[in-house]
Amino acid sequence: MNPIQSFHCKLRSLATVLDGETARLLRALDGEDSDFEDSSARILCDLYSEVQTLKDDVNAHLDKARLESRESTHFIKAAKVLMKKNSADIIKLREFFQKYGYQARDKEDSACEHRVSNSSPGLAVCKDTQEPGVKQELSEPRVPRGSAPEEPLRSPQLSDFGLQRYMVSQGPANPRQETVSLKEDRASETTPAKDPSVQVLKTPRCALKMDDFECVTPKLEHFGISEYTMCLNEDYTMGLKNMKSIKSSPLSGVGGEAVETGPVTSDNSFAIPGPMIQQLEKNDVEYINSPLPPKFCTPGLKIPSSMDSTDLVSIDYPLSKPNSSPTDLEDKDCAPLILNSDECYQSFADPHSPTITSYENFTTPSPPKVTAIPEDILQMLKYNSNLASPIDVKAMPLRRGFTSKGQSTRGAANKENW
C-alpha cells in the first residue's frame, strides 16, 4: 500500500476524532451534556412524586368513603331501632284505640287517597266518592250487614283498668247541644249514661273488717305510768296543791305564827321543804307587795345628794284577797325579796378624810425672777415710741389663780379646770 495514502487515512480518522471530541467538549462547556444525562433521572423522580401524590389522594378519598359508610351504617341501625320502636308504639296505640271503638280505614279508601295524591286534582276521581251527597256517609266507618251495631266512642271508665270496685254511681250527664252534623247528633243520642247496654256499677258496700288490725288505745304501762307506779310519778305541782290545802285547813298556824319550816308530807306525795313552798307562794301575784327602791352605798365615799336624807317610806298596797291572814306573809326562814344595801355595810365606820401628801399639795409656787429680756420683747420695745430705751423689769402683778400665803388652797386646787 502506498505510505502516502495510509498517512492520509490516519490523518482523516484523527480529524474526525478531534471533531467529535471538540463537539463533546463544547457541549460539556454549555451544560447540554449534564442535562441530557440527568433528564431521565429527573423524569423518573417527577413520575414518582406524581404517583405518591395520587396515592395520597386515593387514600384520603378511601378514608372519607369509609367514614361515610360507617356513619351510614350507624344511621341505618338507628333507623331500624326507631322503626321497631315506632311499630311497637303503633301497635299499642292501635290496640288502645280499638279498645275504645276506633276502627281503621279500609284498604280501598287508602288506595283511593293514594291515587288521588299521585294524579292531577282535576282528573282524579274516586269511584266511591262520585256523588257529593254521599261523602258524609262514606267518611264514617263501614259496618258489615251481618254484624251488630258497634259501640260508639266513649270516655275511659274505671272498669277498663280493672278498678270496678272503686266506681261511683254518677247521674245522667247533660245532653250535648245539637249540631248540624249527623255524626254529633248520633253520638249525643247514644251517650253511655242513656245507653241501656252500659251497666254502671254501684259503689260496693262492705262492712269494715277489724280482723286484720285492732284499734286499741295505748296502754299506760308503755309510758311508765300505771296504777302501781302512779304515786311514784307525782311531781312538785301536786305537792304544792296539797300544801295549799293544808294551809287553808285549820291545822295551820293561827295567831300570827309562822308556818313550819320542816318538810311537809302527805300520803301520796314526796317530802317538800317548807321554805321552798313559802318562797314559791310568796312569788304568787296575790301575795306580792310592791318592791322598795334599792339604796346604793359605797364604803369609803359619800356622795352629796339634793334629795332628803330620810329613808324612803314603803307603801303597803292592799292585798287582792281580803281574807288572807298575816301568817301567809310571814317569812322568817326565807331570804327577803329586797336587799337593803345599807344593812350590808352597817358594821363599817365612817372613813377618815384622806391625807394629802407633799406631791398632792396644790399651792402655787413663787414666780421666777426675770433677769434677761427675751428677744421677742426687745423687738416689741424697739418699735414702741413711748419707750426710748429699755427700762428695768418691774414686778409683774400676780396672774389669776396665784394665791398669797393666807389664801385658801381650794381655788388653787381647781386650776386645771380654768
From Swiss-Prot:
Phosphoserine modified-residue sites: 34, 119-120, 139, 155, 159, 290, 325, 353
UniProt region (Disordered), positions on chain: 111-157, 170-198
Gene Ontology MF terms: microtubule binding
GO biological process, one term: negative regulation of mitotic spindle assembly checkpoint signaling
The keyword Amino-acid biosynthesis is annotated on this UniProt entry: no
Places the protein is found: Cytoplasm, Cytoskeleton, Spindle; Chromosome, Centromere, Kinetochore; Cytoplasm, Cytoskeleton, Microtubule organizing center, Centrosome
Segments for region (Required for localization to kinetochores): 350-417
Region (Binds microtubules and contacts the microtubule-binding domain of SKA1): 196-417
Keywords: Cell cycle, Cell division, Centromere, Chromosome, Cytoplasm, Cytoskeleton, Kinetochore, Microtubule, Mitosis, Phosphoprotein
Gene Ontology cellular component terms for the protein in this record: centrosome; cytoplasm; kinetochore; meiotic spindle; mitotic spindle; outer kinetochore; SKA complex; spindle microtubule
Major location category of this protein: cytoplasm
Region (Binds the NDC80 complex): 102-417
Family as reported in the entry's similarity comment: Belongs to the SKA3 family.
Role noted for this protein: Component of the SKA complex, a microtubule plus end-binding complex of the outer kinetochore that stabilizes spindle microtubule-kinetochore attachments, promotes alignment of chromosomes at the mitotic spindle equator (chromosome congression) and assists suppression of the spindle assembly checkpoint. Kinetochores, consisting of a centromere-associated inner segment and a microtubule-contacting outer segment, play a crucial role in chromosome segregation by mediating the physical connection between centromeric DNA and spindle microtubules.
Subunit structure, interactors included: Component of the SKA complex, composed of SKA1, SKA2 and SKA3. The SKA complex is a homodimer organized around a central W-shaped coiled-coil structure, formed by the interacting domains of SKA1, SKA2, and SKA3, each end of the 'W' is extended further by the C-terminal microtubule-binding domains of SKA1 and SKA3; the complex forms extended structures on microtubules. Interacts with the NDC80-NUF2 heterodimer of the NDC80 complex (via coiled coils); the interaction localizes the SKA complex to the kinetochore and is required to establish kinetochore-microtubule end-on attachments.
Protein name, UniProt field: SKA complex subunit 3
Organism name: Rattus norvegicus (Rat)
